[in-house]
Amino acid sequence: MKPSIIKILTALFLLASIPGCKKNYIINDEQALYFQFDYVNHAWGYQHSGFIIDNEGSVLTYNNPENWNFPDKDLILSEKDVEENLSKCTPGPVAVTNDELKKYTGYIRHIASSKVTALKNIGADAGTAQFICWQYSPHIGEYKGYLIKMEGDYTCENLNFYSKRVVSWMKDIHGNLDQF
């Protein structure tokens, strides 16, 4: 081969190996938020309630918080927005064990890489409950949410095998909160 062709091929190889500016959402120790159950209803008066599971396994509840930071259409929240939301939560009467938290956070990467069914309108006035898991990108200070399941006026669900397990687990937590 000619030296110029070798130089061109080498340059192309080097350019191809440079990583792009992809947002790298991961699970890490800096992440404050892992899971969220969020219920909103605009019928018969505004209702907004739910709970968050944080990095310590605490179940933090909220009920009609003022100035809540909702994620955008792509389920993105800034680190500042998450911190503000967490400050509006109250520690709940239940918590998640470290083993349980490790088990369920291990499912997030699978859920994040799966598709969600099409949104269906099946009712009115029931409101909408969303089960969401979160990944964090420390380099840009953003949280990316992944819809696990939506119930109520509108329904859809993540097609990943682990989704049903996570939803069942979160419903158990929600049921335990209702007992207090």
Label the model's feature ranges:
Residues 23-43, 49, 110-180:
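Short, well-ordered, aromatic-rich surface patches in folded extracellular/luminal domains
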